[in-house]
Curated annotation (Swiss-Prot):
Plasma. This is Alpha-1-antiproteinase 2. The reactive center loop (RCL) extends out from the body of the protein and directs binding to the target protease. The protease cleaves the serpin at the reactive site within the RCL, establishing a covalent linkage between the serpin reactive site and the active site of the protease. The resulting inactive serpin-protease complex is highly stable. GO terms for cellular component: extracellular space. The record marks 385-386 as: Reactive bond.
Length: 421
């Protein structure tokens, strides 16, 4: 066996990562050490654990988005910051030294402001809250640890990942790469109810551990679009390229506002449940300005200042995906050692030096007309006398799905070309 054995970290993620678990009993035993805490301190201590990490997740989401966007302005972007952060927070349980510090700081955590135990508490409560938020969103997720039958992982690492991230562990023979691929792909296909097949295309026979994270998500709009009003329309990819796309249409009362700061129109559409979609349409020539300016504070202001107006909304139906090699993206955020031969993952196993040789993230998004059915009620909408304005998402726009309950960005994307798969 070579002196440095690669650890293949495989990630498949959609809109969010949901792992049923709770640290409520553990946190009930925590005592407040300061007897003269300020009102702000007391409020922070009473704050839900998942809310404590939400600002960091938002910072990570926008930082990662900008790095991905700067790599190419001609392709769609779609990824789940919550899923990526969860996977690497899990990985940090087995990291030590600079490797450990780089991972958490790369995820936008400041260890002088938030203790590591609070970070893991936050993730556990976040995943638990997402998984139990409601029954109106179809969510399927899982974390699978596939361990080579020749490897001996440390008991503490296995206990921590099972307790905190509810990971399943499987023994596998990576030397038989075809059978190993089949076992992993069967696990993902079963977990996603057949929606995701052949996730793993190739494996290194020297792999000793593969972490597979998958997600399947399907949400419905609170106010659906009517399919009979969907028509083929132009979408302007750039000044020289126009494609024909099925464009949904609805004349209704929408949460929409114009942002001078972003030079963009912002449309908020609620899913049935706790999720809200932000569709952000920049003025002509202002896409990069939007990408450079958007922050978690601006999003919070939109949510806190919602108001409705009658608008003709035109939104493309689409099905897009994003696949990313995180070994080339995360180093730009300062996470470098875990992908090198200097990686210290001795908290996973002390038998051989490990490095992450592969870290894949895949996310899939489908937007269509479907929404929840009204149950035995009829709603009349009073139309304005003046002609309502048109809001046409017929050029590149930014998309964010946000969970209102946990205050977390479930996914971030950019639609450059709705016909691009």
């Amino acid at each position: 066996m070579p002196s440095s054995v690669p650890w293949c970290l495989l990630l498949l993620a959609g809109l969010c990562c949901l792992v049923p678990s709770s640290l409520a009993e553990d946190l009930q035993g925590c005592a407040v050490q300061e007897t003269h805490a300020t009102a702000h301190d007391e409020e922070h201590l009473q704050e839900p654990a998942e809310h404590k990490i939400a600002p960091n997740l938002a910072d990570f989401a926008f930082s990662l988005y900008r790095h991905v966007a700067h790599q190419s302005n001609t392709t769609n972007i779609f990824f789940s910051p919550v899923s990526i952060a969860t996977a690497f927070a899990l990985l940090s349980l087995g990291a030590k030294g600079d490797t450990h510090t780089q991972i958490l700081e790369g995820l936008s955590f400041n260890l002088t402001e938030l203790a590591e135990a609070q970070i893991h508490d936050g993730f556990q409560h976040l995943l638990n809250a997402l998984n139990h938020s409601d029954n109106q969103l179809q969510l399927t997720t899982g974390n699978g640890l596939f361990i080579d039958e020749s490897a001996k992982l440390l008991d503490k690492f296995l206990e921590d990942v099972k307790k905190l991230y509810h990971s399943e562990a499987f023994s596998i023979n990576f030397r038989d790469t075809e059978e190993a691929k089949k076992q992993i792909n069967d696990y993902v296909e079963k977990g996603t109810q057949g929606k995701i097949v052949d996730l793993v295309k190739d494996l290194d026979k020297d792999t000793v551990l593969a972490l597979v994270n998958y997600i399947f998500f399907k949400g419905t709009w609170e106010k659906p679009f009517e399919p009979e009003y969907t028509t083929e329309q132009d979408f302007h990819v750039d000044e020289k390229t126009t494609v024909r796309v099925p464009m949904m249409h609805r004349l209704s009362s929408f949460d929409v506002q114009y942002s001078d700061t972003l030079s963009s129109w912002v449309l908020l559409l609620d899913y049935a449940g706790n999720a809200t979609a932000f569709f952000i349409l920049p003025d002509q020539g202002k896409l990069q300005h939007l990408e450079d300016t958007l922050t978690k504070g601006i999003l919070a202001r939109f949510l806190g200042n919602r108001h409705s107006s009658f608008v003709n909304v035109h939104l493309p139906k689409l099905s897009i995906s994003g696949t990313y090699d995180l070994t080339s993206i995360l180093p730009e955020l300062g996470i470098t050692k875990v992908f090198s031969r200097q990686a210290d993952l001795s908290g996973i196993t002390e038998e051989v030096p490990l490095t992450v040789s592969k870290a894949l993230h895949k996310a899939v998004l489908t937007i269509d007309e479907k929404g929840t059915e009204a149950a035995g009620t009829t709603m009349w909408e009073i139309m304005p006398i003046s002609l309502p304005p048109d809001l046409k998402f017929n050029r590149p726009f930014v998309l964010i799905i946000y969970d209102r309950n946990t205050k977390s960005p479930l996914f971030v994307g950019k639609v450059v070309d709705p016909t691009q798969k």
